[in-house]
């Protein structure tokens, strides 16, 4: 591990937890493990924003539907060609809400006062995530719409072509922050060649991270294929991600590293 990465990691985690498996480079780190455990190892008030796409656990109403693999729930691809499945998506709504509130509470303590939080979600879990956010002590401030522009048509029904970003802040959020006025609706199609089953468009995340103060440090507790970490770095931020699924820990780390090496002036 490069010395500068070790120093960066020491800035955010307690000394006794430094052996956490991790990967990264200049200004970015991905930690391998369970968010509930790792997030409690962070020092207080070290992050300027929390931006993440947690498991929705919403792919069906009945237990048999919820207990399907994430590829079966969220993709029409042949499983032989689909990205790996990911962990943590089989909770029922009540246990999911409790779990969300628990890690959000610990994450808030690791964020600076006024830090924004942005959480992706779909319509099924929208009410629950707003409860969890507030139970954890965050101030709920609104919702951003991601319009995917296309979706499967359903006769006699509205298309489900949007997902949402519930957002808030860790206490008061001064208007004097050096952040401009940001859109409330983003229109991007789903990525065509996805590394992750539920991967979000890179440009969408590049737009979202701008809610953070310039040059700040962003936390993504469910970094999957590393999209938020990559977007943060491309926009001039530092980033720390957490990923529990073995396959995505490696895929995400490799993706971020290779993408940054291909960028002029950002080679590791």
Enumerate the predicted regions with their spans.
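Core catalytic lobe of class I
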Residues: 1-7, 11, 15-249
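Asp-based, Mg2+/Mn2+-dependent phosphohydrolase catalytic module
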Residues: 205, 241-242, 261-268
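Conserved SAM-binding loop
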Residues: 252-253
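Conserved hydrophobic residues forming the short capping helix/wall of the S-adenosyl-L-methionine
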Residues: 133, 256, 260
